[in-house]
Regions:
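Transmembrane and membrane-interface helices of multi-pass
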Residues: 1-194
């Protein structure tokens, strides 16, 4: 990365990070923003909890897998990578050494997931009385439309200019001098979703 400033790579990577976060959390955001009078009910919040954590843990796990995968492949994990793994004949023999070599990644992953769930549960959603349904629904619709616009901007790479469409993996190469540096801009969940 010496030929290009690391800060610039991280800056351009934010567009791809935001896009992946929006894709992974779209259902959670939708359930949280819909103007439903029962969305603060404990049973509904339990559903929202699982809708949030199941896709996020899967996406988070792909990043940890890529920490071990990238040094060997020199590319981000994509759906094509799974096609290669699918045809691997000695995968069972490789799993035990993999677990032994990368035990610290598993430990770190489960520690961070536990911390994430602990912190999530510390935020208590309290039912608030709805004094005026008209104000509640109109403010909810405005929030929904406002956040919907921001989500679309994130998925499109940060704006609504005429050349901006939903970004893809090739867009990362527009921001680098050396094509190998595009991997520093990309993230694994984004690559899996867009490949």
């Amino acid at each position: 990365m010496s030929d290009y400033h690391s800060f610039d790579l991280f800056y351009y990577g934010l567009a791809f990070d935001n896009c992946a976060i929006m894709y992974v959390n779209l259902l959670f955001i939708l359930l949280s923003l819909l103007p439903l009078w029962y969305n603060k009910h404990p049973k509904f919040q339990k559903i929202v909890f699982w809708v949030y954590f199941i896709p996020n843990i899967i996406a988070y796990a792909t990043n940890f897998i890529d920490m071990a995968y990238y040094p060997f492949s020199k590319s981000r994990l994509t759906t094509a990578s799974f096609a290669v793994i699918e045809h691997e004949k000695n995968i069972a023999k490789l799993i035990v050494p993999f677990l032994g070599d990368y035990w610290y990644l598993f430990l770190w992953f489960f520690f961070l997931i536990g911390l994430w769930i602990f912190l999530y549960k510390r935020v208590k959603v309290q039912p608030a009385p709805i004094t005026s349904k008209k104000i509640y629904y109109s403010s909810s619709v405005l929030c929904f439309l406002g956040f919907g616009t921001l989500i679309m901007m994130a998925i499109r790479g940060g704006g609504f200019t005429s050349d901006t469409r939903p970004i893809n993996m090739l867009d990362a190469s527009r921001h680098v001098n050396i094509s190998a540096q595009a991997d520093a801009i990309l993230n694994t969940p984004f690559c899996l979703i867009r490949s």
